[in-house]
Amino acid sequence: MSQAHTPSAPLAEVYDVAVVGGGINGVGIAADAAGRGLSVFLCEQHDLAQHTSSASSKLIHGGLRYLEHYEFRLVREALAEREVLLAKAPHIVKPLRFVLPHRPHLRPAWMIRAGLFLYDHLGKREKLPASRGLRFTGSSPLKAEIRRGFEYSDCAVDDARLVVLNAISAREHGAHVHTRTRCVSARRSKGLWHLHLERSDGSLYSIRARALVNAAGPWVARFIQDDLKQKSPYGIRLIQGSHIIVPKLYEGEHAYILQNEDRRIVFAIPYLDRFTMIGTTDREYQGDPAKVAISEEETAYLLQVVNAHFKQQLAAADILHSFAGVRPLCDDESDEPSAITRDYTLSLSAGNGEPPLLSVFGGKLTTYRKLAESALTQLQPFFANLGPAWTAKAPLPGGEQMQSVEALTEQLANRYAWLDRELALRWARTYGTRVWRLLDGVNGEADLGEHLGGGLYAREVDYLCKHEWAQDAEDILWRRSKLGLFLSPSQQVRLGQYLQSEHPHRPRVHAA
């Protein structure tokens, strides 16, 4: 493939669609639109997936608890999307069994069985096994009084990589993707949108577009009010969700879904083979979405829920890492944060022949692809040349000709006998079949360059900077990879030094 780079957009260029926001919804819409033949520009004020999209529970799931709120349409769509995404991205999406311990005073067994029956049959389920009842023995990690439970299927995903892969797909279909670029203002003039943009170095430029998509996530309403000088058609409620990561709490590759006295649920999920991720919380958030952080109350809450279920008791000192994000949910006036709909709402503004503004409110990681299709359906009247929907069967980058992570790991081990098995597995899970591009021209370990710690080599860092918009250590350690837990503080400092030396400023990204 050619090494053509994404150029700085000249002032006079006109795009079909400009997308503001580099989270999962923004990149999903950009990829879908570009694949249908539209010229697309996307800007993200920080890094791809830097906020909400990398702070999720990292699940592709129907949302079992949404059935209690009668969200049947959302659950049906999400359940069907599990199978679609499992086929599109088998390297970053994997089946996961969930164990639900039964606590009779919270929900009776008949209610759980009924919910799981619906969950098994509401959506298309071909690859994932059905739910079943369980009996726990003395060897269970759960407390002795918890003797019965249920088990069902969903999927786990690397959330930030799902975003990056969609951005790569958009770029490979011709889209221009600009990170660290903020849309300062946008206005309609002479049938076009005029966007004024500011790079992280303070330089300014402008573009024009025939349609504007506001996928700014937590900033969606603020963008309409402050940057477009209009009234937002919907209110947004920012709901904080926080997670903690602790050393591996139990053996096995299954997750737990834990019921709490407040009728909320908390997940305990295997994380990077060595850890357990616990979350999430639900509470209103009023501050700057970019500065959200877990509170002491949330930490205590998560520990209390886990300690009510497991024999092994956790304390705050056991927490290795925490992360928090805000979910920008469409305000449906629900009393409780956990009851607010996770469904998405699209708002189209295009009166009197004006160029359209499409704003995205709400949504969840699992249904991003369907949201993007819905967005393109709304924009279709404005683009006579719009191609048909295409994303359902198209693999995401790295999912092409991919049998399984295990088979790809075996191929890597056979071709590169010197390659550490654990590293081969991580690369297969991270890059899928694109790993062959990462290793192009590599004949031995020396060709990987400096080992920066935790299985991270200079070769991979260079690849991420050149092909995946990475610019600083956080981009690499917490989003492109999840190696932040594996590098010591001094190794992280060395990575920063390497980036400053070898990649001091890389606003352009070459085609992969």
Curated annotation (Swiss-Prot):
<keyword id="KW-0560">Oxidoreductase</keyword>
<dbReference type="InterPro" id="IPR006076">
    <property type="entry name" value="FAD-dep_OxRdtase"/>
</dbReference>
<dbReference type="Pfam" id="PF01266">
    <property type="entry name" value="DAO"/>
</dbReference>
<dbReference type="InterPro" id="IPR031656">
    <property type="entry name" value="DAO_C"/>
</dbReference>
<dbReference type="GO" id="GO:0005737">
    <property type="term" value="C:cytoplasm"/>
</dbReference>
<comment type="similarity">
    <text>Belongs to the FAD-dependent glycerol-3-phosphate dehydrogenase family.</text>
</comment>
<keyword id="KW-0285">Flavoprotein</keyword>
<dbReference type="InterPro" id="IPR036188">
    <property type="entry name" value="FAD/NAD-bd_sf"/>
</dbReference>
<dbReference type="InterPro" id="IPR038299">
    <property type="entry name" value="DAO_C_sf"/>
</dbReference>
<dbReference type="GO" id="GO:0006071">
    <property type="term" value="P:glycerol metabolic process"/>
</dbReference>
<dbReference type="GO" id="GO:0004368">
    <property type="term" value="F:glycerol-3-phosphate dehydrogenase (quinone) activity"/>
</dbReference>
<keyword id="KW-0963">Cytoplasm</keyword>
<dbReference type="GO" id="GO:0046168">
    <property type="term" value="P:glycerol-3-phosphate catabolic process"/>
</dbReference>
<keyword id="KW-0319">Glycerol metabolism</keyword>
<dbReference type="Pfam" id="PF16901">
    <property type="entry name" value="DAO_C"/>
</dbReference>
<keyword id="KW-0274">FAD</keyword>
<protein>
    <recommendedName>
        <fullName>Glycerol-3-phosphate dehydrogenase</fullName>
        <ecNumber>1.1.5.3</ecNumber>
    </recommendedName>
</protein>
<feature type="binding site">
    <location>
        <begin position="16"/>
        <end position="44"/>
    </location>
    <ligand>
        <name>FAD</name>
    </ligand>
</feature>
<dbReference type="InterPro" id="IPR000447">
    <property type="entry name" value="G3P_DH_FAD-dep"/>
</dbReference>
